[in-house]
């Protein structure tokens, strides 16, 4: 019994790594909730319709993912060089934090979207290095548990600044400020939270797995990318997993990124939407921990397909979503599987790649994850514009989950 307890006791470095998830998840939650409302207010002031608002928001998200897809493998490969990972990670965090603050200074919708792209690219870039740090902060037989705890505490920890921000926005009139001013303050609060929770990791992290510094490090990083891509097909498990991940996580991230925009386009009550998404975070906390524990009894190759199938059901349900209570049901079910599919995918990948090339491989992982989500957002945006129905746009994501499920089963047999 004591040995089992010791096995799951977090080290100081593991706690610092998890704490960064608590910080950046606050930004993710803000992007999924208050930031779309801020943009909606600016869009209405600029004369955009609800369909145009949803479409432009989707196009901005797509721009972020294309930029991330271009930068991730380059930065990830460079970060595998000794003593490069932490400085580049720090730079990306700084870009995200500064961008988060700067969004509050925009007064029209177009500058706001441009700054949002800037901040989201910094955030996405930081995740390439953060995810690749997993092989440095823990050992393979603890990866599923540590990764799950990262997502779990990220979900519940992000609620702390969010509740403060939500109370500030909803109660703006009672404290004598406008709602737009309250939204500005919410952005500053979130940026400060993100920065403070990053500091322990910056103090404690040391790169363990690396390649030695060579002359012309940037040129060598491009050469290593080419070598990895040429030989990727030889590692069938990694190759087919990345193809599967490209599809299913694209749908997951699109649902996360566009949930509030989707509900707003359907005319749902704003307060109800925000509270429903808060419930998603709360439900995701114990659910991610449960999946972490289940990973000790069942392989991730069994648990991940269960999560993919659940998301296919979520997309199907979105076709018929019309009422506020249905959005609440959707929020709860998403929370049940969101943390599991993200955490298990990250740890599953970390276990099947060479640890000394974690940055390089996680650069590819990020392309197939955050960098590939342009496809999902484009499906939603184009589908909404062509049919005039947000339900059809979001429901069409079921195709990504079906294809992802099939490809994952192929990868798990390699």
Map each language-model feature to its residues.
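Multi-pass alpha-helical transporter architecture, strongest
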Residues: 193-204, 395-414
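Helix-loop junctions at membrane interfaces in 12-TM secondary transporters
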Residues: 103-116, 319-331
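Structural signature of the two symmetry-related core transmembrane helices
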Residues: 87-102, 302-317
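A membrane-interface helix-boundary motif in multi-pass transporters
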Residues: 50-52, 169-192, 382-401
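Juxtamembrane intracellular "pre-TM" segments in multi-pass secondary transporters
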Residues: 2-14, 206-242
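Glycine-rich segments within core transmembrane alpha-helices of 12-TM secondary carriers
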Residues: 147-169, 366-376
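Helix-to-loop junctions at the C-terminal end of transmembrane segments
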Residues: 70-84, 286-300, 384
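Helix-loop boundary and gating motifs at the non-cytosolic
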Residues: 7-65, 237-269, 273-276
């Amino acid at each position: 019994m004591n040995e089992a307890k010791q096995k799951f006791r977090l080290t100081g470095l593991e706690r610092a790594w998890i704490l960064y998830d608590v910080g950046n998840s606050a930004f993710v939650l803000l992007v999924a909730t208050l930031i779309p409302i801020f943009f909606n207010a600016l869009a209405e002031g600029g004369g955009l319709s609800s369909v145009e608002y949803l479409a432009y928001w989707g196009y901005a998200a797509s721009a972020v993912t294309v930029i991330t897809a271009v930068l991730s493998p380059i930065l990830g490969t460079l970060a595998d060089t000794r003593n490069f990972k932490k400085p580049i990670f720090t730079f990306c965090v700084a870009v995200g934090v500064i961008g988060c603050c700067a969004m509050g200074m925009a007064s029209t919708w177009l500058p706001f979207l441009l700054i949002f792209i800037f901040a989201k690219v910094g955030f996405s870039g930081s995740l390439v290095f953060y995810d690749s740090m997993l092989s440095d902060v823990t050992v393979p037989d603890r990866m599923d548990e540590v990764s799950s705890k990262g997502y779990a505490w990220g979900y519940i920890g992000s609620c702390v600044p969010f509740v403060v921000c939500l109370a500030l926005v909803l109660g703006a009139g009672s404290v004598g400020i406008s709602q737009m001013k309250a939204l500005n303050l919410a952005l500053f609060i979130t940026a400060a939270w993100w920065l403070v929770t990053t500091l322990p990791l910056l103090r404690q992290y040391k790169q363990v797995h690396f390649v030695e510094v060579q002359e012309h490090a940037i040129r060598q990083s491009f050469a290593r990318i080419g070598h990895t891509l040429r030989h990727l097909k030889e590692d069938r498990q990694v190759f087919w997993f990345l193809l599967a991940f490209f599809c299913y996580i694209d749908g997951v991230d699109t649902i996360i990124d566009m949930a509030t925009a989707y509900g707003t386009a359907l005319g749902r009550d704003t307060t109800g939407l925000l509270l429903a998404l808060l419930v998603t975070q709360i439900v995701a906390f114990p659910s991610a921990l449960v999946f972490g524990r289940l990973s000790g009894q069942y392989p991730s190759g069994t648990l991940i397909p269960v999560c993919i199938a659940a998301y296919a059901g979520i997309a199907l349900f979105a076709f018929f979503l019309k009422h506020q209570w249905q959005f609440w049901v959707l929020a709860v079910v998403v929370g049940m599987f969101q943390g599991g599919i993200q955490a298990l995918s990250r740890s599953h990948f970390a276990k099947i790649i060479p640890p000394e090339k974690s940055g390089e491989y996680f650069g590819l992982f990020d392309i197939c994850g955050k960098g590939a989500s342009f496809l999902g957002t484009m499906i939603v945006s184009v589908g909404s514009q062509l049919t005039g129905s947000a339900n059809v746009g979001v429901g069409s994501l079921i195709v990504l989950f079906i294809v992802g499920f099939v490809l994952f089963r192929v990868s798990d047999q390699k």
